[in-house]
């Protein structure tokens, strides 16, 4: 496992983003782990988060993109901090934009924030966590309505590796439906591999008991 992936897992734990216990997802699934990206709340945390996204983007997409698109609302700060990190860490100066949930009828009108989209632009979508892929199905018509863009891919922070609308994971469904690359900074398989029986700040987060519950969860909800 790449060093930045291990650092990112530690970072999520430090920020209280990745936790283990008893939770219920929006879809009603009882889950033994939870990824709450709303817990990235400070400037230094957002800076580091952008650096992790930039590292994963460099590995998976090199510099084959013109624009980072962050779907509203959580994707907005992600596209901003990631574009800054790409510039500062890799000298890649990329544009960013996001959509408005509500179209303005005064001042800077239109549905987009940040850069405008042009025909032929290579767009990389930056998201937080995709469980069912709903935001991507909403994003694609928005992008295509603005210009004849070429969507190069989607990157998220954590692939939960759960079934989406069918038997496959949401990322696999999106990749097959739209024909572009999908990837994550880390997968839950990598998280489990790294944390299983490993002491972090004096605590073992994934004990044998927790690992057993995670295994049972994936038997029921894991992607094929």
UniProtKB/Swiss-Prot annotation:
<feature type="binding site" description="in other chain">
    <location>
        <position position="101"/>
    </location>
    <ligand>
        <name>5-phospho-alpha-D-ribose 1-diphosphate</name>
    </ligand>
</feature>
<dbReference type="InterPro" id="IPR004467">
    <property type="entry name" value="Or_phspho_trans_dom"/>
</dbReference>
<feature type="binding site">
    <location>
        <position position="131"/>
    </location>
    <ligand>
        <name>orotate</name>
    </ligand>
</feature>
<protein>
    <recommendedName>
        <fullName>Orotate phosphoribosyltransferase</fullName>
        <ecNumber>2.4.2.10</ecNumber>
    </recommendedName>
</protein>
<feature type="binding site">
    <location>
        <position position="106"/>
    </location>
    <ligand>
        <name>5-phospho-alpha-D-ribose 1-diphosphate</name>
    </ligand>
</feature>
<dbReference type="InterPro" id="IPR029057">
    <property type="entry name" value="PRTase-like"/>
</dbReference>
<feature type="binding site">
    <location>
        <position position="100"/>
    </location>
    <ligand>
        <name>5-phospho-alpha-D-ribose 1-diphosphate</name>
    </ligand>
</feature>
<feature type="binding site">
    <location>
        <position position="160"/>
    </location>
    <ligand>
        <name>orotate</name>
    </ligand>
</feature>
<dbReference type="GO" id="GO:0044205">
    <property type="term" value="P:'de novo' UMP biosynthetic process"/>
</dbReference>
<dbReference type="GO" id="GO:0046132">
    <property type="term" value="P:pyrimidine ribonucleoside biosynthetic process"/>
</dbReference>
<dbReference type="GO" id="GO:0006207">
    <property type="term" value="P:'de novo' pyrimidine nucleobase biosynthetic process"/>
</dbReference>
<dbReference type="InterPro" id="IPR023031">
    <property type="entry name" value="OPRT"/>
</dbReference>
<comment type="pathway">
    <text>Pyrimidine metabolism; UMP biosynthesis via de novo pathway; UMP from orotate: step 1/2.</text>
</comment>
<dbReference type="GO" id="GO:0004588">
    <property type="term" value="F:orotate phosphoribosyltransferase activity"/>
</dbReference>
<dbReference type="InterPro" id="IPR000836">
    <property type="entry name" value="PRibTrfase_dom"/>
</dbReference>
<dbReference type="GO" id="GO:0000287">
    <property type="term" value="F:magnesium ion binding"/>
</dbReference>
<keyword id="KW-0808">Transferase</keyword>
<keyword id="KW-0460">Magnesium</keyword>
<keyword id="KW-0328">Glycosyltransferase</keyword>
<comment type="similarity">
    <text>Belongs to the purine/pyrimidine phosphoribosyltransferase family. PyrE subfamily.</text>
</comment>
<feature type="binding site" description="in other chain">
    <location>
        <begin position="73"/>
        <end position="74"/>
    </location>
    <ligand>
        <name>5-phospho-alpha-D-ribose 1-diphosphate</name>
    </ligand>
</feature>
<keyword id="KW-0665">Pyrimidine biosynthesis</keyword>
<feature type="binding site">
    <location>
        <position position="104"/>
    </location>
    <ligand>
        <name>5-phospho-alpha-D-ribose 1-diphosphate</name>
    </ligand>
</feature>
<dbReference type="Pfam" id="PF00156">
    <property type="entry name" value="Pribosyltran"/>
</dbReference>
<feature type="binding site" description="in other chain">
    <location>
        <position position="26"/>
    </location>
    <ligand>
        <name>5-phospho-alpha-D-ribose 1-diphosphate</name>
    </ligand>
</feature>
<feature type="binding site" description="in other chain">
    <location>
        <begin position="127"/>
        <end position="135"/>
    </location>
    <ligand>
        <name>5-phospho-alpha-D-ribose 1-diphosphate</name>
    </ligand>
</feature>
<comment type="subunit">
    <text>Homodimer.</text>
</comment>
<dbReference type="GO" id="GO:0005737">
    <property type="term" value="C:cytoplasm"/>
</dbReference>
<comment type="function">
    <text>Catalyzes the transfer of a ribosyl phosphate group from 5-phosphoribose 1-diphosphate to orotate, leading to the formation of orotidine monophosphate (OMP).</text>
</comment>
